[in-house]
């Protein structure tokens, strides 16, 4: 995979992660139960983040071993294949606690790769 393709996928991860964080700001966990559009939007964003992560090469992943790459991809798989039993507590916890550091790490990796 070319450096250009890697950067595109990392930018997708960054942009969709930032969007999930922005959409969840000012919301609470219970809103996932009462706001169907919020639920669907956040699930879709998490699916795309995981899909993009799954397309990042192992060489690029190795540059930031602090990112739990396999967990990001596993979340995508769980949401896609377990579409009928999404655990809102896990989804909310992931978005509110795990995405902000993921955003910073991916942004850092994009900057590193852009400078090389």
Residue ranges and their predicted role:
Residues 1-116:
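Solvent-exposed interaction patches of small proteins and small membrane subunits
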